[in-house]
Regions:
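C-terminal structural segment of proteins
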Residues: 1-268
Length: 268
């Protein structure tokens, strides 16, 4: 199938993009890489009257060192992160995660910002960046605001952005040199959507211990008492049950295994 006819716009600045979004309202879609939106357009799952391609905006490709964090422009590609072409604030976690996203052709075009706004529960970045404690900056006609990544996704394919807002950057805290991380996802074969995913951060210098379970039926689950879970991994099954992640025996098992294998990576 092919998409319905739409007007194609390629703004050169964030201000131009916001103006176009303001004019089009709910009839517009933003193209940041197209690896998810493209197939949805072709299958006519979305039918925008205007497509706004933001990949030509230089500010959205910038990388900035912000002291205790690295700020990624929304249009930084998965491949750029995988290849180490930009600074890594996570001690190898982000390149590792990027390398496991779909296929190289997808990683060449797909973007970190596009993935976050698409809000697919099975996507890698929403879970990973929630565990790291990252924030996104969104811009609209009323100014800028920051949203913690673990609060960005409201439900499946829905974010807390409002009409006319554009995600412009992602602020990723620098992990300390003695930080440990774990990440594990389960797919039936390479390139498929994850059926289970877990991310763990233990950063003593920042006093930060976070465990996030992704690839759920909705937004990632941030475990409230992560320190206890890591010190008592035998409680994994209970955590899965208490967070409503044991929909059936299969789901419960793959999520238990995913969580254990991520935790195992940070254990002494």
């Amino acid at each position: 199938m092919k998409p319905f006819a739409f007007d194609y716009e390629k703004p050169a600045t964030i201000a131009e993009a916001l103006a176009l979004l303001g004019e089009a309202g709910d009839d517009a879609k933003v193209l940041a890489g197209g690896q998810s939106l493209g197939p949805m357009l072709n299958m006519r799952l979305v039918r925008p009257r205007r497509l706004i391609d933001i990949t030509g905006i230089p500010d959205l490709h910038q990388i900035t060192d912000d002291g205790d964090a690295i700020v990624f422009g929304a249009c930084v590609t998965h491949a750029a992160i995988e290849d180490g072409r930009i600074p890594d604030p996570t001690g190898g976690m982000m390149p590792n995660v990027a390398a496991g996203i779909a296929y190289r052709a997808v990683r060449n075009r797909g973007t970190i910002g596009g993935s976050l706004v698409h809000a697919d529960p099975a996507a890698d970045w929403i879970t990973t960046l929630a565990a790291i404690g990252a924030e996104v900056t969104v811009t609209g006609i009323d100014g800028q605001r920051r949203i913690a990544v673990d609060k960005l996704m409201v439900s499946t394919f829905e974010t807390s952005l409002v009409a006319g807002e554009l995600l412009v950057s992602i602020r990723v805290p620098k992990l300390s040199s003695d930080a440990k991380w774990g990440f594990y996802k389960f797919c039936r074969k390479t390139g498929e959507f994850a059926e289970a995913m877990s991310a763990v951060i233990v950063d003593p210098a920042r006093g930060d211990i976070r465990v996030v379970i992704g690839a759920t039926d909705t937004r990632p689950v941030v475990i409230a008492d992560a320190a206890t879970l890591i010190s008592k991994p035998e409680s994994i099954a209970t955590v899965i049950e208490e967070n409503g992640l044991a929909n059936d025996a299969y789901d419960a098992q793959v999520r238990r295994v995913s969580l254990w294998r991520a935790i195992e990576q940070v254990m002494p």
